[in-house]
Amino acid sequence: MPNVTIARESPLQDAVVQLIEELDRYLGDLYPAESNHLLDLQTLAKPDIRFLVARRSGTVVGCGAIAIDTEGGYGEVKRMFVQPTARGGQIGRRLLERIEDEARAAGLSALLLETGVYQATRIALYRKQGFADRGPFGPYGPDPLSLFMEKPL
């Protein structure tokens, strides 16, 4: 299996921008605009975001981020994505574990997330990693197309 690395990197690199555009198209095909809660590239580059890039043999194949809410004491998992051609190699699990490490290092007490109900594989990964269903949080309201989850750290 090719070497996979996960590291904090800028989301403003060309290959990462292309990956985020692919993710946006994917989510846009699944959900209406009002149910897509996407952080744009400029927001992903802010200091309160820890943006991670997965590379396989040096090529960008996935990403994930944690938005740190210091007031609430939690981190929100954002922009988790692995290219379809790179799936099946535990990259998503490794990204999520690295996000958890970043959250612990930042002194956060929990990770929260919002994901779409049509993403069964992603939901299964979150549950396998210890996330449990919860109600809306932060800026979110009830949405029949959203699932909200939490994992204490």
Curated annotation (Swiss-Prot):
A Pfam family this chain is assigned to: Acetyltransf_1
Superkingdom of this protein's organism: Bacteria
CDD domains given in the database record: NAT_SF (cd04301)
GO function term, MF aspect, one: acyltransferase activity, transferring groups other than amino-acyl groups
UniProtKB keywords: Acyltransferase, Transferase
InterPro entries named among the record's database cross-references: Acyl_CoA_acyltransferase, Bact_Acetyltransf, GNAT_dom
UniProt xrefs under PROSITE patterns: GNAT
Top enzyme category: transferase
EC number: 2.3.1.-
Ranges where the N-acetyltransferase domain occurs: 4-153
Cited function: Participates in the tryptophan-dependent indole-3-acetic acid production, which is a phytohormone released by A.brasilense.
PANTHER family in the cross-refs: AMINOALKYLPHOSPHONATE N-ACETYLTRANSFERASE-RELATED, AMINOALKYLPHOSPHONATE N-ACETYLTRANSFERASE-RELATED-RELATED
Protein name: IAA acetyltransferase
Organism: Azospirillum brasilense
